[in-house]
């Protein structure tokens, strides 16, 4: 059963999907991918719902529920889907109301107290008006132990709800309304666990596989230079992560703070279909969507055991004086404050977006070899 994008990648040859740095997800279709991160970076694969852009990052959070079909088009689709559809297009078509009262409910349970449930109600109020309500929920305890905090992380707590209403205004005109909302509030990891063999020049050696949970050597990164300039170290030749507890496990991590992950996404579409004649159809779509996203992750993947020595070299009496202060991370309205006495690296992503789409399409159904979409 295809329940989310990872399942879709298993059944569609050439499609690779993974979480990306920042607030997004990375996609590759037939070896073509776009992995840049930034406000000016646009993806090269378009993810639509009912023909309008839904947002690949938002859909990667909750997965699929109550769909009619999933369309995967490989290769450039710019003629109908815009300049960003260089890799291809994934179009999610939601199930519409039908003419009979019906409903369904299913629950799947697994280890780590995993529960996934789906509910659907189809409600034909009259011959001309029908509605369909669907709800999906996924909860799971954390599968990775953070030995530093003592908590389990990488859990799931997400739900999605969709309301679809169809109104047959006349025999030639139909109005379709769709409102979709999803929300996540959990401690899932943004990317995963580091594998590194420390190297004083490269940070992590490109010639060795390394160990799970081993942080990079700060001498091989700009961190050592910044620490020296800031007076936190007496030299740039100082590795803050020497002697750390590298667990070498996929089931355990040793990081300063547990991840945080929050998202609320709403998508509202109104579509008008009107048959002008037997040969011409007019389709007008309008969409409004919002996304409120935040996550925090510990990006040095371990806890530095060597405190900042300051400008005094190791062994100097003054170097024994603890160097610490209260540092605040994440910006106003987000993040946290904590006592800082050693190296640490946190990644934050905050996204507040609002999108409007409007489209009018004229579709022909002419007798003969030529038809058009305008």
Mark where each language-model region is.
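Transmembrane beta-strands of outer-membrane beta-barrel proteins
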Residues: 103-105, 131-133, 175-177, 282-284, ...
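Residue-level signature of outer-membrane beta-barrel architecture
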Residues: 49-51, 74, 123, 165-168, ...
């Amino acid at each position: 059963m295809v329940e989310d994008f990872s399942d879709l990648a298993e059944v569609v040859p050439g499609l690779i999907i993974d979480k990306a740095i920042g607030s997004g997800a990375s996609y590759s279709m037939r070896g073509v991918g776009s992995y840049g991160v930034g406000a000016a970076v646009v993806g090269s694969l378009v993810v639509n719902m009912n023909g309008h852009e839904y947002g690949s990052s938002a859909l990667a959070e909750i997965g699929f529920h109550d769909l009619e079909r999933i369309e995967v088009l490989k290769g450039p689709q710019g003629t109908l889907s815009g300049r960003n559809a260089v890799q291809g297009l994934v179009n999610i078509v939601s199930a519409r109301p039908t003419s009979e009262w019906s409903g369904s409910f299913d629950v799947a349970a697994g280890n780590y107290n995993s529960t996934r449930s789906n509910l659907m109600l189809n409600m034909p109020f009259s011959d001309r008006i029908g509605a369909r309500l669907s709800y999906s929920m996924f909860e799971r305890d954390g599968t990775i132990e953070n030995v530093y905090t003592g908590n389990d992380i990488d859990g799931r707590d997400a739900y999605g709800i969709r309301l679809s209403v169809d109104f047959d205004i006349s025999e030639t005109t139909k109005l379709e309304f769709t409102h979709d909302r999803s929300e996540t509030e959990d401690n899932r990891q943004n990317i995963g666990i580091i594998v590194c063999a420390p190297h004083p020049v490269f940070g992590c050696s490109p010639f060795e596989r390394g160990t799970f949970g081993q942080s990079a050597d700060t001498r091989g990164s700009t961190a050592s230079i910044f620490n020296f300039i800031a007076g936190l170290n007496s030299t740039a030749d100082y590795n803050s992560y020497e002697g750390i507890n590298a667990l070498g496990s996929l089931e355990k991590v040793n990081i300063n703070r547990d991840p945080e992950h929050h998202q609320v996404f709403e998508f509202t579409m109104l579509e008008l279909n009107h048959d002008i004649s037997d040969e011409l159809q007019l389709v007008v779509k309008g969409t409004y969507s919002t996304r409120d996203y935040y996550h925090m992750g510990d990006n040095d993947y371990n806890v530095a055991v060597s405190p900042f020595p300051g400008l005094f070299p190791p062994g100097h009496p003054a170097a024994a004086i603890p160097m610490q202060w209260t540092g605040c991370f994440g910006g106003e309205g987000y993040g946290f404050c904590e006592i800082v006495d050693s190296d640490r690296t946190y990644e934050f992503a905050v996204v507040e977006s609002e999108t409007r789409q409007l489209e009018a399409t004229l579709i022909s159904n002419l007798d003969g070899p030529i038809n058009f979409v305008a």
